[in-house]
A protein has these predicted regions:
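Histidine-dependent nucleotide/RNA phosphoesterase domain, centered on the 2H-phosphoesterase fold
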Residues: 1-167
């Protein structure tokens, strides 16, 4: 099964992101827009993993306090367009803890540098307009283990488990 570890977004954050997607579409941008229910922040991508239990065991060792996360700016990595996040030492620390827990158990994950973003559009065409994101923030209080399956109408993400914030 294809797995990743993510922060699931609040309704306020998803609403602001869908508003941005609609504005981009209205500006003539085309591509594969991320479905509202699939908007998330990836902390670590594992890819194909035969068993989710060792991953949940690794996540269960995490200790982190709830923290605030806010949207800030739009950008792109080639034809992948994303929403950015306000700089957050707590988010960076959480990503490091997640990746350390996986590495400690020799679980496979993409070791590219953590670059916090929320994917809005894949295979985007057009020019990135100078739109402003609606202000939105949320309290991060859990980390989720997610499974990714290909469905009839795109990817379907299912939460397999979550770890709540604790000090």
């Amino acid at each position: 099964m294809r797995l990743f570890i993510a922060i699931r977004l609040s309704d306020e954050m998803r609403d602001a992101l869908v508003h941005a997607q609609n504005e981009l579409y209205d500006c003539g941008v085309r591509g594969r827009f991320t479905a509202e229910e699939n908007l998330h922040l990836t902390l670590a991508f594992l890819g194909e993993v035969p068993d989710a239990e060792p991953v949940m065991d690794a996540l269960s060792t995490l200790s982190f306090a709830p923290f605030e996360l806010g949207l800030e700016g739009l950008g792109c990595f080639g034809d992948l367009w994303w929403a950015g996040l306000k700089e957050s030492a707590a988010l960076e620390a959480l990503a490091r803890k997640v990746r350390h827990a996986l590495a400690e158990r020799e679980l496979p994950f993409d070791r590219k540098r953590f670059s916090p973003h929320i994917t809005l559009i894949r295979n985007a065409s057009g020019k990135l307009p100078g739109l402003q994101l609606r202000p939105a923030s949320m309290t991060v209080s859990a980390v989720s283990l997610m499974r990714s399956d290909r469905g009839k109408h795109g990817m379907v993400y299912t939460e397999l488990g979550a770890v709540e914030a604790r000090r």
